[in-house]
C-alpha cells in the first residue's frame, strides 16, 4: 500500500548532504578510496574535560529523566555568561535564552512560530539549505536574496523589492557565512536592524561559525548592535567550536518574544536536550578556551594549504577570515555539478557543488577543511594530478 505525501514534504528538496553521503557510499562500494571534502564535520575529538563532565553527570540517576524543554537554568546561565564574556552582551537567561537540540533544529522550527502559509521568508542564496527547508515545512515561501562576490557575499538590502519586504515575516542571515566564508561587520548588522524595523521583519542570525576565525579576526555577534534584540534572535551551538556536532546542544538568544514562542513550540514537539549533554555544554562554555585557539590554528594551516594549492593551479583566491570552508569558482568549461562530478570520477575527491546551496551558488564549489591534514594533503595532490592548470 502506498500513501500520498503531504504537499509540504513533496515540496521539500532532497537534503544536500544526504545525497553526498549516498555518492560516497556508492563510490566506496566500487572500491574507490574516496576523500570527502564535502560535509563540515570536525575530525578532532571533543576535549577531555567536556567528556569527563558528561561521564560524571551520566552516573546521576536524576539526569536520566525528562529534561526541561526550555533548558536547565544552569545551561541557560552558562550561555548568558558566555555572551557577556565573549561579546559584552547581557542576556536574561530566563527570558532571552532557550536550549535547542543543536541550532539546526531551532532554525528549522523558527518559521513554524512566525510564518503562516503564503508568508514570505527572506533566505540567503547561496545559503544553508535548512533556512528554505524550514520555511517550506511551515508553509511559507522562501524568497532568495542573492549573495554575490561583487557585494562581498552580503545581501543587498536595497535591492529587495519593497513589496516583497512588506510580505516578509522572517529574514535569515548567517555570518561568518556558510558556504562562502564571508564575514559581516557591525555596520552591516546595523543596516539589517534598520531594514527589519522598517518592514516589521524578525531577523534570525545563524552564528554557528563565530568562533572559527583566523589572523586575529574576532567575528561580532548580531546582538552587539543597538536595537538587534528588538528585531531578532541569534542561533548558536557548541558543535563547531568544541567539536561536538554529535552531542546536539545549541541555543537561541535575543528577542524575548521570539525566544518564548520557539520554546512554546518546542514544548509541544520535543522533550528537550538530555541533561548530561547540557552539563557537557556548560563545561565547554565555562571551561578553558585554549583548545578553541588551537583548533583555529589547525584550520588556518589547512586553509592556507588549500588556498595555496588552488592558486598554484590557476585560481585567484583570497584567504577567508573565518569558517572552515573554501568557496571557489569552477574553471572554464564546467558548471558546478559537472565539475564536482568530474573531480569525484577522476580524483576520488568529493567537493560540494555550489548549486546545493541555491541558484546563486552556480559557478562555485565548496571545500570543507574538516578532515585529517594528511588526507587533505593527499586530496590536494589528487586535484593537481586531475586538473593541472585551470583557466576561467
Swiss-Prot record:
Source organism, top-level taxon: Bacteria
Residues the record lists as binding pyridoxal 5'-phosphate: 103-104, 128, 178, 209, 237-239, 248
Biological-process GO terms, alphabetical: lysine biosynthetic process via diaminopimelate, diaminopimelate-aminotransferase pathway
Top enzyme class: transferase
Alphabetized UniProt keyword annotations: Aminotransferase, Pyridoxal phosphate, Transferase
Enzyme Commission identifier(s): 2.6.1.83
Binding site for substrate: 15, 40, 104, 128, 178, 366
Residue numbers of N6-(pyridoxal phosphate)lysine PTMs: 240
InterPro entries attached to this UniProt entry: Aminotransferase_I/II_large, DAP-NH2Trfase_DapL_Desulfo, DapL/ALD1, LL-DAP_aminotransferase, NHTrfase_class1_PyrdxlP-BS, PyrdxlP-dep_Trfase, PyrdxlP-dep_Trfase_major, PyrdxlP-dep_Trfase_small
Annotated metabolic or biological route of this protein: Amino-acid biosynthesis; L-lysine biosynthesis via DAP pathway; LL-2,6-diaminopimelate from (S)-tetrahydrodipicolinate (aminotransferase route): step 1/1
PROSITE patterns found in the cross-reference section: AA_TRANSFER_CLASS_1
GO MF entries: L,L-diaminopimelate aminotransferase activity; pyridoxal phosphate binding
Catalytic activity entry: (2S,6S)-2,6-diaminopimelate + 2-oxoglutarate = (S)-2,3,4,5-tetrahydrodipicolinate + L-glutamate + H2O + H(+)
Family label: Belongs to the class-I pyridoxal-phosphate-dependent aminotransferase family. LL-diaminopimelate aminotransferase subfamily.
Subunit field text: Homodimer.
Protein's job: Involved in the synthesis of meso-diaminopimelate (m-DAP or DL-DAP), required for both lysine and peptidoglycan biosynthesis. Catalyzes the direct conversion of tetrahydrodipicolinate to LL-diaminopimelate.
Name this polypeptide is given: LL-diaminopimelate aminotransferase
Gene label: dapL
Amino acid at each position: 500500500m502506498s500513501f500520498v505525501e503531504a504537499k509540504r514534504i513533496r515540496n521539500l528538496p532532497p537534503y544536500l548532504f544526504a545525497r553526498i553521503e549516498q555518492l560516497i557510499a556508492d563510490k566506496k562500494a566500487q572500491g574507490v578510496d574516496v576523500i570527502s571534502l564535502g560535509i563540515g564535520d570536525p575530525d578532532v575529538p571533543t576535549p577531555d574535560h567536556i567528556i569527563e563532565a558528561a561521564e560524571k553527570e551520566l552516573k546521576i540517576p536524576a539526569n536520566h529523566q525528562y529534561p526541561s524543554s526550555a533548558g536547565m537554568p544552569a545551561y541557560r546561565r552558562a550561555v548568558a555568561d558566555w555572551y557577556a564574556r565573549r561579546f559584552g552582551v547581557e542576556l536574561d537567561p530566563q527570558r532571552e535564552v532557550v536550549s535547542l537540540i543543536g541550532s539546526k533544529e531551532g532554525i528549522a522550527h523558527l518559521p513554524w512560530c512566525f510564518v503562516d502559509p503564503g508568508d514570505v521568508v527572506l533566505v540567503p542564496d547561496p545559503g544553508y539549505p535548512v533556512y528554505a527547508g524550514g520555511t517550506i515545512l511551515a508553509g511559507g515561501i522562501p524568497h532568495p536574496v542573492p549573495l554575490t562576490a561583487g557585494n562581498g557575499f552580503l545581501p543587498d538590502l536595497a535591492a529587495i523589492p519593497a513589496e516583497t519586504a512588506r510580505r516578509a515575516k522572517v529574514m535569515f542571515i548567517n555570518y561568518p557565512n556558510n558556504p562562502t566564508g564571508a564575514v559581516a561587520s557591525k555596520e552591516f548588522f546595523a543596516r539589517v536592524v534598520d531594514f527589519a524595523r522598517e518592514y516589521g521583519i524578525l531577523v534570525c542570525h545563524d552564528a554557528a561559525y563565530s568562533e572559527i576565525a583566523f589572523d586575529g579576526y574576532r567575528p561580532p555577534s548580531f546582538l552587539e548592535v543597538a536595537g538587534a534584540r528588538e528585531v531578532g534572535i541569534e542561533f548558536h551551538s557548541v558543535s563547531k567550536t568544541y567539536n561536538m556536532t554529535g552531542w546536539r546542544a545549541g541555543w537561541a538568544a535575543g528577542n524575548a518574544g521570539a525566544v518564548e514562542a520557539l520554546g512554546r513550540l518546542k514544548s509541544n514537539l520535543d522533550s528537550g536536550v538530555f541533561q548530561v549533554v547540557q552539563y557537557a555544554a556548560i563545561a565547554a562554555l565555562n571551561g578553558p578556551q585554549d583548545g578553541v585557539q588551537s583548533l583555529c590554528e589547525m584550520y588556518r594551516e589547512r586553509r592556507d594549504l588549500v588556498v595555496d594549492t588552488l592558486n598554484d593551479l590557476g585560481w585567484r583566491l583570497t584567504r577567508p577570515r573565518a569558517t572552515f570552508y573554501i568557496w571557489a569558482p569552477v574553471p572554464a568549461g564546467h558548471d558546478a555539478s559537472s565539475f564536482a562530478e568530474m573531480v569525484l570520477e577522476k580524483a576520488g575527491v568529493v567537493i560540494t557543488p555550489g548549486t546545493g546551496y541555491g541558484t546563486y551558488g552556480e559557478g562555485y564549489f565548496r571545500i570543507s577543511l574538516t578532515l585529517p591534514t594528511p588526507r587533505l594533503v593527499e586530496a590536494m595532490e589528487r586535484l593537481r594530478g586531475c586538473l593541472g592548470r585551470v583557466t576561467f
